[in-house]
């Protein structure tokens, strides 16, 4: 087997995560440029960035799919996962966070902490991803490094510690002061972008540099007792000790190292790459991933080349030249092309075709993938996003990823009958790639319904059908994913008995139906004593309840946040069957739910609007008209920030209305937050419309 080219401790799996316009793609591009992988720098403005390789991204100038790219810096292998910054694609971010070991969070020096940055930050916290901060666009008017520092502290409740401070800002931004080495790095505009000059710290900035270095030393000393002792006895810490302390704090997430620059003008990228290598973790420096066996036994999977193979499939893509690509992160052991692996989630054996290392949209064929590496496999038949591939000798299942339920649906139909089959194939492929996108058929109307995380999400799906699969589709009005639940506990008996010649049917259940906390889903409890309902019929009772949950009693929407306890019943030696108990439970649940004060729930979106002050009254008035509840008002860079919770049903077409109401000067972001009970008058309308 081929030996590793890069030792495990010199591998970095990192993501670049940011708000939509912080300059993330440009930063990724510059990283590829400076590490020597791409010769002409791609620019998002002219739609040519190497990372943004899907057509729609080039047009919209936003990054949709995380392309995994390998590059090298100072003998270290950096696997760069580009994550999208748009709210409708949080699933992509979530999915890439899952396989990252560290992240570079990019913030705009003017915009600072934006709503999307908070979402991405929360996801990085959830997966314990250590990160460093790069404050980008230091050359823009209004650039303020220190503002961003205080916003990260106050809004993200983190501990940002600058390891650099800027020399100048806006047009006057020249470079950075390295607080570890106490040197200035200056990029001179007439020189090549790869060159920077190391100088002494300018006299007028020396005091500020000393103040920030003192803060850095204090933060570093708290990471280690021996450093703390040195700090208190007034001894100088060496450069090595400071670096060691920054890394320890970064891995524990007690320190977030902060750097700055302007990717567009090629300033600050080399020190950023040095920080990635110096402070972000190697695969063997993070907590081992947890796994389970089929019988529920838990196990930790250490990142090592020894041991049986285990990897996580985190993304599926259709490539126009090689067909389906499955991106995997290898956690343990290694995988050779031409070998076999076992999908422990689908319980099926997979043949490993070719193995590829991706450079944005160019590919390099390799013979083996080692622990800690990320690559793409060609030719997997049954593997879905979130599945585990493992050795047949050790059938471990790595943690599953949580995928959000879609909140918006539209009906789609092809413009020509001939495209019907092509559309079905296209949608199936797209659903395989993206677990937050669902396809189903409406039983009553026979229409194909697609569901996703927001209007933009579904627009891009329809767009991709046209571009990649040449299917032109008509799209219906967006529909909201309502839910139903109950508000009071009830007890319900139901007997299902049929005697009409031959063998009868008999199932008899007593159900206790109770409401649960929001977002708890469904819970089934078997509380049968003394075998009054035999063991073998219990699963049928649960199945009957689960089936009844699919269509609520008010308007046929799925029911959630309900607990059902089977506490009594009876059976018949001859006539009882699984079918009879399933029907008894299903009908009993429906009858009970009618008495349990059923209500309709609707998805509430968290909406954040940034508007010039003169339109603030109009914006709030409009949100109130949409049944929105304003939760906070803030000020950022001279604009007003309004945060509100609004029903999704009232938010269709909001971007057009907001644009025309503010002459295009306001911007907004919207993401699903929670489900909430619908007001009575709206509920009656929904029921009337559904039940015709």
UniProtKB/Swiss-Prot annotation:
Q: Where does GTP bind?
A: 18-25, 82-86, 136-139
Q: Name one GO biological process term.
A: ribosome disassembly
**Where is it predominantly found?**
cytoplasm
Per UniProt, which keywords does this protein have? Answer: Cytoplasm, Elongation factor, GTP-binding, Nucleotide-binding, Protein biosynthesis
Could you state a single Gene Ontology molecular function term?
translation elongation factor activity
Q: One GO CC annotation, please?
A: cytoplasm
> Which compartments does it reside in?
Cytoplasm
Query: Which Pfam families is this protein grouped with?
Result: EF-G_D2, EFG_C, EFG_III, EFG_IV, GTP_EFTU
tr-type G domain residues: 9-284
The family database entries (HAMAP family) matched by this protein are listed as: EF_G_EF_2_B
Functional summary from the UniProt entry: Catalyzes the GTP-dependent ribosomal translocation step during translation elongation. During this step, the ribosome changes from the pre-translocational (PRE) to the post-translocational (POST) state as the newly formed A-site-bound peptidyl-tRNA and P-site-bound deacylated tRNA move to the P and E sites, respectively. Catalyzes the coordinated movement of the two tRNA molecules, the mRNA and conformational changes in the ribosome.
Family note: Belongs to the TRAFAC class translation factor GTPase superfamily. Classic translation factor GTPase family. EF-G/EF-2 subfamily.
**Name of the molecule in the record:** Elongation factor G
* Annotated source species: Campylobacter curvus (strain 525.92)
């Amino acid at each position: 087997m081929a030996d590793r080219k890069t030792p495990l401790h010199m591998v970095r799996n990192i993501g670049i995560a940011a708000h939509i316009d912080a300059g993330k793609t440009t930063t990724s591009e510059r990283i590829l440029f400076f590490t020597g992988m791409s010769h002409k720098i791609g620019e998002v403005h002219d739609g040519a960035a190497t990372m943004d390789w899907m057509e729609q991204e080039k047009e919209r100038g936003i990054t949709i799919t995380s392309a995994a790219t390998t590059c090298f810096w100072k003998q270290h292998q950096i696997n760069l996962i580009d994550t999208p910054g748009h709210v409708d694609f949080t699933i992509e971010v979530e999915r890439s966070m899952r396989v990252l070991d560290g992240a570079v969070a990019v913030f705009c020096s003017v915009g600072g902490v934006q709503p999307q940055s908070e979402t991405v930050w929360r996801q990085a916290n959830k997966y314990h991803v250590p990160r460093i901060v790069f404050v980008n666009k230091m050359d823009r008017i209004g650039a303020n490094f220190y503002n961003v520092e205080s916003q990260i502290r106050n809004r993200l409740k983190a501990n940002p510690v600058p390891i650099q401070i800027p020399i100048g800002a806006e047009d006057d931004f020249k470079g950075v002061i390295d607080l570890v080495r106490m040197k200035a790095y200056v990029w001179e505009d007439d020189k090549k972008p790869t060159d920077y000059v190391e100088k002494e710290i300018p006299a007028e900035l020396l005091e500020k540099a000393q103040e920030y270095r003192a803060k850095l030393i204090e933060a570093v000393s708290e990471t280690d007792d021996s450093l703390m002792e040195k700090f208190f006895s007034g001894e100088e810490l060496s450069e090595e000790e400071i670096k060691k302390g920054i890394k320890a704090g970064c891995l524990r997430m007690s320190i977030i190292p902060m750097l700055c620059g302007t990717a567009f003008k090629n300033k600050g990228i080399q020190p950023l790459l040095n920080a990635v290598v110096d402070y972000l973790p190697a695969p063997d420096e993070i907590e081992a991933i947890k796994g389970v066996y089929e019988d529920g036994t838990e196990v930790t999977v250490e990142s090592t080349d020894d041991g049986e193979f285990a990897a996580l499939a985190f993304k599926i893509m259709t490539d126009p030249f090689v067909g389906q690509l499955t991106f995997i992160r290898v956690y343990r052991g290694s995988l050779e092309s031409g070998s076999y692996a076992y999908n422990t989630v689908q319980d099926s054996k997979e043949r490993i075709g070719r193995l590829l290392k991706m450079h944005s949209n160019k590919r390099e064929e390799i013979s083996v993938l080692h622990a800690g590496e990320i690559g793409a496999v060609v030719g997997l038949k049954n593997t879905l996003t979130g599945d585990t591939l493992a050795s047949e000798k050790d059938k471990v299942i790595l943690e599953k990823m949580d995928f959000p339920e879609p909140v918006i649906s539209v009906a789609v139909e092809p413009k020509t009958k001939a495209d019907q089959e092509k559309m079905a194939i296209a949608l199936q492929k797209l659903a395989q790639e993206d677990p937050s996108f669902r396809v189903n058929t409406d039983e009553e109307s026979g229409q194909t319904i697609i569901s996703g995380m927001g209007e933009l999400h579904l627009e891009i799906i329809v767009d991709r059908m046209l571009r990649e699969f040449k299917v032109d589709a008509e799209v219906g009005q967006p529909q909201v994913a309502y839910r139903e639940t109950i508000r009071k506990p009830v007890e319900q008996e139901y007997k299902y008995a049929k005697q009409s010649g031959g063998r009868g049917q008999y199932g008899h259940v007593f159900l206790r139906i109770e409401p649960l906390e929001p977002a708890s889903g469904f819970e089934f409890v078997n509380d049968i004593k003394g075998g009054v309902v035999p063991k073998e019929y219990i699963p049928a009772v649960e199945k009957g309840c689960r089936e009844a949950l699919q269509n609520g009693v008010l308007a046929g929407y799925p029911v959630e946040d309900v607990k059902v306890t089977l506490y009594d019943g009876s059976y018949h030696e001859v006539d009882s069957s699984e079918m009879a108990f399933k029907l008894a439970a299903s009908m009993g649940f429906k009858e009970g739910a009618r008495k349990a004060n059923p209500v309709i729930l609707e998805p509430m979106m968290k909406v954040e609007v940034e508007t010039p002050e003169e339109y603030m009254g109009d914006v709030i008035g409009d949100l109130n008209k949409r049944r929105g509840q304003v939760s906070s008002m803030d000020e950022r860079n001279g604009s007003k920030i309004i945060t509100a919770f609004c029903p999704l049903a009232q938010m269709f077409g909001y971007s057009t209305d907001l644009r025309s109401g503010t002459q295009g000067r306001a911007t907004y972001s919207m993401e699903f937050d929670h489900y909430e009970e619908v007001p009575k008058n709206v509920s009656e309308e929904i029921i009337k419309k559904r039940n015709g």
